[in-house]
Amino acid sequence: MPKKCRHLLQTSDLSLDEIKLLLNKASVYANDFNAVSLETREKMQDKIIVALFFENSTRTVSSFEIASLRLGAKIVKLNMQTSSTSKGETLIDTFKNIHAMQPDAIITRHAFSSAPFKLAEFSQCPLINAGSGTSAHPTQALLDLLTLYRHFGSLENLKGKKIAFIGDVKNSRVANSNIKLLQRLGLEIMLCAPSSMLPITPLKTTHNIEEAIGFADILMSLRTQTERHNAPIFASLKDYGNAYCITQKRLETHAKNKEVIILHPGPVHRDIDIESAVLEDKRSKVLEQVKNGVAMRMAVLEFLLLD
């Protein structure tokens, strides 16, 4: 039997104390990416991390790569389009072969929600879920929390804040992970989407973006995940944007909290998810999320590999 090993497959794998530890460490790195201690660099310099991404990625894979390098570790990034999976090798066999090379950690992304949990059964090194189907994306939720933590100043200040998720909530692993994490921290949540993009949930829901904007201290826009839809829901993305785009006019007219902040996990469909002018607004935290992604993933890698 494989030895017990600490993985990060979903946010519930972490206690609240561990989340606080990660926030504190990541905040240090967000202030200065070079604030890695000599001791950490020395311990990380012989670590080899493998990234197995079976779905496309820009921010997540680059963020993990940069985080690894900033800590002093080495990272091997496989191109799955040219790997033996294209020759019919199964996911499990691919993983077992990479695992046999004894990396110090493996980061994986897959279209199946169950994939990381199945792989964890075979893993004797830390396994990090970088996105699985529609179910989980724990490091994205953690970096989003870091963004809120740094904006509002503390977890205590976050309690009671209202966040509205706008867009394809049903198919969003980002929303799923964020909702589970933020509920633990006492935030009030609303979901805003057309019926076909809403999950069955006890949470507050609305089909009206104006209602969501009026409700929220925090707006998180979500991409329409057309690759996960069985049939078109709107005639075009433009039609969807007419109903659900976060625009300056909607913010000016309906936001009760004029300091409402806007987040998006990316990739952003400009003028469909969020109006270009809003993306350039000081209330947009989208690029801060990207920066915080490197910092949080540095903290996660250090936590799993060294602590």
Swiss-Prot record:
L-aspartate binds at residues 87, 173, 223. Carbamoyl phosphate binds at residues 59-60, 109, 137, 140, 266-267. It comes from the Bacteria. GO terms for molecular function: amino acid binding; aspartate carbamoyltransferase activity. Belongs to the aspartate/ornithine carbamoyltransferase superfamily. ATCase family. Catalyzes the condensation of carbamoyl phosphate and aspartate to form carbamoyl aspartate and inorganic phosphate, the committed step in the de novo pyrimidine nucleotide biosynthesis pathway. NCBIfam families: asp_carb_tr, PRK00856.1. This is Aspartate carbamoyltransferase catalytic subunit. It comes from Helicobacter pylori (strain J99 / ATCC 700824) (Campylobacter pylori J99). The gene is pyrB.
